[in-house]
């Protein structure tokens, strides 16, 4: 709470506080519910890891009788101001649930590869469900880099490996890294047009 107040006291429109409970295996039910309610009360983004490994899924089924996304929905966590990172082990029903709740899903391919999560991100299922798909890097310790261009390339290549050479084309990949990311963060950006935030970079090709 002090961190949120201190960040808002800066009155800087380029810095926004958020709540980041790590994952279902490190955060108690009561703490999850507190975080979700506080985020709603203060209109904060709620970001967390979800279904990153098979063990996480199996442990959740054993302890709670359901898969991780269903568990978070049951305790009132899922919502439009949420970003679920990884999602490698989500099944089709969970992906549909996240899309229904307007939860953004962040694919972190470099981190997934480095940590050996045991499966590729289910791009085709996420795209079919219409969920807001973004691309992330995870932390530097899980990636050895925070290079978004590298993550964009890896995300596109892994989608092609599982599906077809034309899956996740350049336009889609760019949208995931820019427009969809802005939507997930609640930013009026992602387009180059009058009235939008000028969130721009120059790339030397």
Name each model-derived stretch.
Residues 36-45, 77-80, 97-106, 128-133, ...:
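Glycine-enriched alpha-helix->loop->beta-strand junction motifs that scaffold or abut catalytic
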Residues 74-81, 123-205:
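His/Asp/Glu-enriched, well-ordered alpha-helical/loop segment
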Residues 52-103, 113-125, 139, 143-149:
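Catalytic core of soluble alpha/beta enzymes
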Residues 33, 37, 70, 95-96, ...:
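Alpha-helical segments flanking ligand/cofactor-binding loops in enzyme cores
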Residues 47, 85, 106-107, 202:
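Conserved beta-strand positions in the central sheet of alpha/beta enzyme cores
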Residues 1-89:
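Metal-coordinating catalytic core of metallo-dependent amide/deamination hydrolases
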Residues 2, 14, 26, 30, ...:
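Conserved active-site and cofactor/substrate-binding residues in soluble primary-metabolism enzymes
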Residues 108-109, 137:
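Short beta->alpha connector loops at strand-helix junctions that form conserved
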């Amino acid at each position: 709470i002090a961190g949120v107040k201190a960040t808002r006291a800066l009155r800087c429109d380029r810095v926004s506080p958020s709540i980041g409970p790590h994952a279902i295996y490190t955060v108690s039910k009561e703490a999850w519910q507190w975080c979700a309610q506080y985020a709603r009360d203060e209109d904060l983004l709620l970001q967390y890891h979800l279904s990153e490994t098979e063990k996480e899924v199996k442990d959740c089924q054993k302890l709670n009788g359901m898969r991780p996304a269903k568990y978070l929905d049951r305790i009132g966590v899922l919502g439009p101001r949420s970003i679920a990172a990884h999602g490698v082990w989500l099944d089709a029903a969970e992906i549909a649930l996240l899309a229904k709740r307007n939860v953004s899903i962040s694919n972190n391919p470099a981190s997934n590869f480095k940590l050996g999560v045991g499966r590729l991100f289910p791009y085709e299922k996420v795209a079919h469900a219409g969920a807001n798909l973004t691309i992330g890097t995870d932390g530097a310790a899980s990636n050895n880099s925070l290079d978004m261009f590298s993550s964009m390339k890896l995300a596109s290549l892994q989608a092609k490996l599982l599906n077809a050479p034309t899956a996740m084309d350049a336009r889609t990949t760019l949208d995931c890294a820019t427009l969809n990311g802005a939507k997930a963060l609640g930013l009026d950006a992602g387009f180059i047009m009058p009235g939008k935030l000028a969130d721009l970079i120059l790339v030397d090709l």
